[in-house]
Amino acid sequence: MPNIIRKLVENDKKELKKLNRMALQVESFADEMEHLTDEQLKAKTPELKERIAKGESLDDLLYEAFAVCREAARRVLGLYPFHVQIMGGIVLHNGDVPEMRTGEGKTLTATMPVYLNALSGKGVHVVTVNEYLATRDMTEMGELYSWLGLTVGLNLNSKSPEEKREAYNCDITYSTSAELGFDYLRDNMVTRAEDMVQKPLNYALVDEVDSILVDEARTPLIISGQAESSSALYYRADQFTKTLKGQNLNVATSEYEEGDDYKIDLQSKTISLTEEGIDKAEKFFQIENLYDMENVALTHFVDNALRANFIMLHDIDYMVDENQEVLIIDQFTGRTMPGRRYSDGLHQAIEAKEAVPIQDESKTMASITIQNYFRMYKKLSGMTGTAKTEEEEFREIYNIQITPIPTNRPVQRLDHPDLLYPTLEAKFKAVIDDIKRRHAEGQPILIGTVAVETSELISKKLVEAKIPHEVLNAKNHFREAQIIMNAGQQGAVTIATNMAGRGTDIKLGPGVIDHVDPEFRGLAVIGTERHESRRIDNQLRGRSGRQGDPGVSQFYLSLEDELMKRFGSERVSAFLDRMRISGEDAVIKSGLITRQIESSQKRVEGNNYDSRKQVLQYDDVIREQREVIYAQRQEVILATEDMTPVLMGMFKRTIDRQVDGHELAGSLKDEENVKNLLQTLHNTMLPEDGIELSELTGLSVQAMKDLIFDKVKARYASQMEKLSDPERQLEFQRAVILRVVDNNWSEHIDALDQMRQSVGLRGYAQNNPIVEYQEESYKMYNNMIGAIEFEVTRLMMKAQIQPQTAIRQEAPRMTTTASQENITNVDTEHSVSEEISFENVGRNDLCPCGSGKKFKNCHGRTHIA
């Protein structure tokens, strides 16, 4: 192990030497650039663009382009990038992550690679964690890029499609990660090329890359439509759950006590009914066996009600706003996430718990993970002060290396060892005493909490102590920038949940660094408990001691903290017993304790990484399917020529499936079976007089296929004659294909989503859930393709086309499924199908009619009934 560590350190040193040499080369252009007039410096942009057009690469232009941007920043912003910032900029251009300490000027560092890559004209996306930072950075840095002759756009959720398209067409576009992902999904739901907003994905530079590519990666981006409402069942399950006896997650000391109706696994935060709880459920719902197959839906509602009431904590996992809406709280930033909802009915269960209106469940129409979205960029890089702890994840998932960049000035912050107390009460008493002591000296103090609840508790105690202070949490995030701006002033006391002000500088006020005692110089950061991620702790610490300023950090912990309860509190308690440390005010400083806590954090980080990896593994299964469907959709939308050859392939395969299906159900030499086939053809693709029994009788299977195909071609030609204008024919073809593809694709991914939630149970049967999911999804995909081709054939053949009437296809509304959209002036004949009898067809076999659906979901419904 020491050899591996030594090797990594040596690699970092080699990389830094190389970056140092390259940065010196950029600096060698400084005099030349300084002597240029403003007009001459601005003229460098078109000159560099021309050199790219003539075949020079971006790497060839790096030194000169960086020097141009550096000099322009000095003139426009009054800021001149340091040597270490140039090094960071080179790492970003190379598609990697420079780890730069908080306060080292990451925003300015990004200007150089953004300028260089924007010269290609292919677009650069600068990605931030929220819309406030996107707007701020675009306003501040946009001035520099505009001065240099580049166009800058801002992409926000509130923008119209026209405004979004304009923003994406700029050389540089500022946006949030979620908005980029949703725009990609929406672009693949439109029905006209002119409605698309994004260009091909080229280069993304992600600010706070660990927050976006790691923390947010557990939450897939989903566009959904409404499913049927089940409000009454949520309320009923909630009523039952409130009758149960047991412990809440926030006060649980053990997983289960004798007589409890449910038990909680503290490590995985899962919950299940005990035997006593199951008995109560069966009596409450008046059923014999809760886990009978017929009660599967009920157990789903009960499980969600259990999680909502005993695992999901008010003001920690979510809050209820003044509009009686349940808002999720981001566990890493402390901000609320409007528009985001827990999936699979959990959000509705929380709404029932809080007695607020229950919103309808949703049906997935399009989805993608953050990981798979960003992996589509040709080049991806990002900036953060805390990425080294997630180095393996960046390398394995994104193929990105982390390069630590030295600070411009040495760090002067004093980082004290953790202080551990036996109880929460003793810990908070010590925190308040420390705040009083530092406040009396005029030192600005930033208190970091993990939950809104804790921030309000400390605020209450500070009010009692008559110490003026500000609270920054999910409930007042709109004042975030203003609160953080004043947090460095003399005597300021600020409480922040999960450092919600990340990305906003805390500038020290006059007199703050002049105290005679180093302990009271600069900003004091007080952590009230360790977060489950070491990065979040490091981000909190990093608010102090920026750019070589003095500062101090101190974490206060207790054995009753959530992290300690979940991991390792028994060992720590045993250690305290051995050391004979007892009493409410007992406190311990020990390297062993700190190491124990760090190993607990590593375990949580490992669990979280596994969780993100699993999300990615499931999404990887449908990634290829999504890319194929979206690529084919694009071809249809962008088609300028008649799509008859494509349609003929669909007709041919549909006919083959129908004939082969009937042959499997019973020999087509039998006249009764031929009649069944004829009835199917009349129902799905040919009129009554289009083909007759006598024409099919006595033919071989292949001869039947050829005859039917000839008849279908003739029927298609007569349909197209009603649309004499080639442009109208193309629009009709496009409308039919897109309607069918969108309907079937949304059904497919919703089915995959439901299967993913159930496939995990197969692990109990010693089956690998991922492998099972891959195999099932592949079968479902092939069935979907068959269903698409069948439905397109049916619509093209049976649609009643009104001659000389314009056809217009509209994009599907995001709140509904594509199947609910109407295609103007295209209607399907309502032919009543006669019941067809199929012998020897299994329930789960494909229906012989060729629809691509399982027999039990198609003609088998009547047969099985």
From Swiss-Prot:
Alphabetical list of Pfam families matching this protein: P-loop_SecA, SEC-C, SecA_DEAD, SecA_PP_bind, SecA_SW
Cofactor(s) the record lists: Zn(2+)
Keywords: ATP-binding, Cell membrane, Cytoplasm, Membrane, Metal-binding, Nucleotide-binding, Protein transport, Translocase, Translocation, Transport, Zinc
EC main group: translocase
InterPro entries per the UniProt record, alphabetical: Helicase_ATP-bd, Helicase_C-like, P-loop_NTPase, SEC_C_motif, SecA, SecA_CS, SecA_DEAD, SecA_motor_DEAD
PROSITE patterns xref list: SECA (PS01312), SECA_MOTOR_DEAD (PS51196)
Topology within the bilayer: Peripheral membrane protein
Major localization listed first in the record, in broad terms: membrane
Gene Ontology MF annotations: ATP binding; metal ion binding; protein-exporting ATPase activity
Compartments where found: Cell membrane; Cytoplasm
Cofactor note (record): May bind 1 zinc ion per subunit.
GO BP annotation list: intracellular protein transmembrane transport; protein import; protein targeting; protein transport by the Sec complex
NCBIfam families the UniProt entry points to: PRK09200.1, PRK12904.1, secA
Family statement: Belongs to the SecA family.
Subunit-level organization: Monomer and homodimer. Part of the essential Sec protein translocation apparatus which comprises SecA, SecYEG and auxiliary proteins SecDF. Other proteins may also be involved.
Full protein name: Protein translocase subunit SecA
Organism: Lactococcus lactis subsp. lactis (strain IL1403)
Gene expressing this chain: secA
